[in-house]
Regions:
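Sec/Tat signal peptide C-region and signal peptidase I cleavage site
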Residues: 18-24
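The canonical Cys-X-X-Cys-His
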Residues: 164-176
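Hydrophobic helical h-region of N-terminal Sec-dependent signal peptides
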Residues: 8-18
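Extracytoplasmic c-type cytochrome modules immediately beyond a signal peptide or single-pass transmembrane anchor
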Residues: 25-163, 181-193
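Bacterial N-terminal signal peptides that target proteins for export
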Residues: 1-9
């Protein structure tokens, strides 16, 4: 639907510093606690990591990895909500999912079959950013044990991640009033137009 563009921020904003290129790739570093980054700092960090996420996810030809950035972003910027290993996360919704997902509804509803959510992830370890998996949820009509969601993921090297459906659904079932979906932090949520 829309190609996302994050605001470009100064490299030193919010305590973020970018080190000199190492091994022909820029190092995306965060000084201090990454939970303390302001919006400009998060944007600068995301912009530093952005191209390498897409390059990694698409290395092995994953179909969703090749197109998810053309979908609707669900937040103004990446954020660290806690799940998925304390990674920065940014979710994109395909055309089928976007209208319903962007309501951030709670209650008795179900996403339409064919909805796909792709969640980018960036880890920070020892002050340095690294690409995490691209987490994918696909709404189907034949997976009642998982609230009709099919869970998958693409590793940073583009290979399919081997995951157990129950590993994902056991956590997502905690969002039972949200059709097993986690939502971005409230302060970064976008809404449907």
């Amino acid at each position: 639907m829309k190609r996302t563009t994050m605001a470009t921020a100064a490299a030193l904003a919010g305590g973020l510093t970018l080190a000199a290129p190492l091994a022909a790739q820029e190092v995306c570093a965060v000084e201090g606690d990454y939970y303390d980054l302001d919006a400009a700092g998060v944007d600068a960090f995301y912009n530093c990591m952005s191209d390498r996420m897409v390059e990694g996810y698409t290395t092995e030809g994953n179909e969703i990895a090749a197109i998810y950035r053309d979908w609707t972003p669900t937040a103004t910027r990446a954020a660290v909500p806690g799940p998925h290993g304390d990674r920065f996360l940014l979710t994109f919704a395909n055309d089928i999912a976007a209208e319903q997902y962007l309501k951030f509804e709670e209650g008795d509803f179900e996403m339409p079959v064919g909805s796909v959510l792709a969640k980018e992830s960036i880890a920070v370890r020892d002050g340095t950013g690294s690409v995490g998996p691209l987490f994918i949820m696909t709404k189907v009509d034949d997976a009642p044990d998982n609230d009709n969601w099919l869970y998958s993921a693409v590793q940073p090297n583009g290979k399919d991640m081997k995951i157990s459906q129950s590993f994902c659904s056991d956590c997502h079932i905690g969002f039972d009033t949200q059709d097993s979906m986690g939502y971005p932090l409230e302060e970064v949520r976008l809404t449907a137009n």
